[in-house]
Regions:
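Structured beta-strand/loop patches that form or line metal/cofactor-binding pockets in enzymes
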Residues: 1-43, 311-313
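Hydrophobic faces of well-ordered beta-strands that scaffold small-molecule active sites
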Residues: 33, 120-124, 146-150, 173-177, ...
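Shared catalytic-loop signature of beta/alpha-barrel
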Residues: 196, 207-224, 229-327
Length: 356
């Protein structure tokens, strides 16, 4: 699926998304989910191709002949495979959707959600010029989004933030480095504190908790961890070591709803706020993010935005929309609450496989 506009981070630039969709037939009820792995292993070691192989050859065989009484047992069946959370999460989430449909309840309620609407922020990629960035921010504020996140990298950090604080002094603003810096860059990151940021997301290495501990001691601005957190155990270590003050929970990165809820609960017990990050999902993945964001400790606006921000035409009906107040109404229909557009999915599909 071609994006409405290219999206650039410190790691790469995305113009087109190759999306892996997963259907789970649970006693005749179809659940849908999306594997968020990208085409290249820049954000995560996983790719769409590795996820396909893992689902077909390793993960599906682990559950195909197993009896389980609830969706929250699927994760434990898949845990024998190390890593590959995005592949695991897509299979597990599809089962959650099917189970919610079987019970006739919205997925949000089924996983323990408490909100009827969620607050929305927006993530803006690296732009060629400061004027282009400021115009993009103005457009998103006019659309109602409650929080602005911009991607940064060395050479495109202080000046973009300075410009936005000059033009928009009162907005909720944060930055995301996607591991673009090292601990030796801490004096530069310290300079960002003068711009009253909500947080600095994943400034250092994607697997480096130790350096984040040292950096957080030098900063008053909260560090938010993203790529460092793949498991409940890593989240616990980050919290107890003091590596961060906020955690971004991405459904695919942690392996699905079961682990996402465990991390959510852990953070809540320790007073660590969380929010839901995005991975340029289609509407199917976005629907799961909406449900996840209804849990009580998702107190910060996440990267769950309207379909039209990313796609000329989404693959669900209705498309995800954001209110003028910057919120998304949580659907009340059973399961994810949106209908996959089978005609459009068939038109876009280049490969499929049925596992029985």
């Amino acid at each position: 699926m071609k994006l409405v506009a290219p999206f650039e981070t410190s790691m790469d630039r995305t113009d087109v998304r190759r999306i892996l969709l997963v259907q789970a037939d649970v006693d005749g009820v179809i659940g849908w989910a999306e594997c968020v792995a990208g085409e290249a292993p820049f954000y995560s070691p996983e790719t769409a191709d590795t996820a396909w192989l893992m689902l077909r050859d390793f993960l599906w065989p682990l559950i195909k002949e197993k009896d389980f009484s609830s969706a929250d047992q699927v994760w434990d069946l898949l845990a024998r495979v190390r890593g590959h959370n995005m592949a695991k999460g897509s299979l597990e989430a599809a089962v959650w959707d099917a189970e919610a449909k079987q019970k006739g309840v919205p997925l949000a309620r089924h996983i323990g959600g408490v909100r009827e609407e969620i607050a929305c922020g927006v993530s803006i990629g690296i732009k060629e010029s400061l004027d282009e960035l400021a115009a993009a921010v103005q457009k998103e504020l006019a659309a109602g989004y409650q929080r602005i996140k911009i991607k940064i990298k060395p050479g495109k950090d202080l000046e973009p933030v300075r410009r936005l604080r000059q033009d928009f002094p009162r907005i909720k603003l944060m930055v995301d480095a996607n591991s673009a810096y090292t601990l030796q860059d801490w004096p530069l990151l310290k300079q960002l504190e003068g711009f009253y940021l909500m947080m600095i997301e994943q400034p250092l290495g994607w697997d480096d908790l130790y350096s984040h501990v040292a950096l957080q001691k030098k900063l008053d601005t909260p560090i938010c961890l993203d790529e460092c957190i793949h498991t409940e155990e890593q989240a616990r270590a980050a919290i107890e070591l003091g590596a961060c003050k906020i955690i971004n929970i991405k459904l695919g990165r942690v392996g699905g709803h079961t682990v996402a809820r465990r991390i959510h609960d852990l953070c809540q017990r320790h007073g660590i706020p969380v929010w839901c990050g995005g991975m340029l999902e289609s509407g199917i993945g976005r629907a799961h993010n909406i449900a996840l964001s209804t849990l009580s400790n998702f107190t910060l606006a996440g990267d769950v935005a309207a379909s039209k921000r990313y796609w000329e035409e989404d693959i669900i009906l209705p498309q995800v929309t954001v209110s003028p107040q910057g919120t998304i109404h949580v659907p009340t229909a059973p399961g994810i609450g949106f209908e996959p557009r089978l005609d459009r999915i068939d038109k876009l599909t280049v490969r499929k496989e049925r596992l029985a």
